[in-house]
């Protein structure tokens, strides 16, 4: 974009709207920007993310507000050394024109040595997030790539599904705050921290990832037994109790022991709060918060 004269941006800053934004460039920082795509101008709603990117290295997404997509609001995978922090990812368009029908999804998150912390995911049917492995081939079925650290995030008002996926990935899920809302389904999914998936190998068995999960809180209110149990015992009720029917007959105690880690995967240090403190910090500071607009203010209030 070549301008012929000086441009002054006043008040609330920059909002990019109308079409998807995709980053394939390395050594990039995006900070204090809004991405509110919508479905009025985008002519190809399938695969249209408000903000996404893959195949890059050394990328930071910081204090951005991302919403109103027709596929996922924010999907980042197949990146190396990636950080998404202090962002608000909200209100995917469930009926935005995707050819598969209802499609209000938060994002697919992955990458090698990727950190996702202090983000707010609000009002998505599913993929809050969906942890997704990149296309790189894994030797001998071992988990030798895609190390993801997911901590101090707030997940609010998921519909049918909160976090899931993670096939053959190495993931820390630490001190996150899950809060069911009006759209959240009843039953055990109200206590869902993470529904683990696996990859089927050629011999008919399954290849699992390695996960460290601790300190997560599910706040469903005083009368919600599912969320209370998941908070008290993250693994038993927030994870083991969340396997899909496809796996329930094949998940043995040996499987459970093999996927559960007693120590977290090593990552660069991130200032880590308790789940309760993270909830307050994220609501106070996440998103394009130097000048918080009416959309983000409403999401936070809700």
Residue spans for each PLM region:
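Long, contiguous C-terminal flanking segments immediately downstream of a protein's structured core
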Residues: 2-3, 18, 178-302
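Short, small-residue-biased leader/transition segments that mark boundaries at the very start
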Residues: 4-9
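Extracytoplasmic/secreted cell-surface and envelope-processing proteins
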Residues: 39-44, 70, 138-139, 186-187, ...
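Extracellular beta-strand-rich solenoid/capping regions of secreted or surface-exposed proteins
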Residues: 2-3, 14-32, 37-57
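Right-handed parallel beta-helix
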Residues: 10, 26-39, 55-68, 80-98, ...
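Structural detector of coil-to-beta-strand junctions
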Residues: 20, 50, 72-73, 95-96, ...
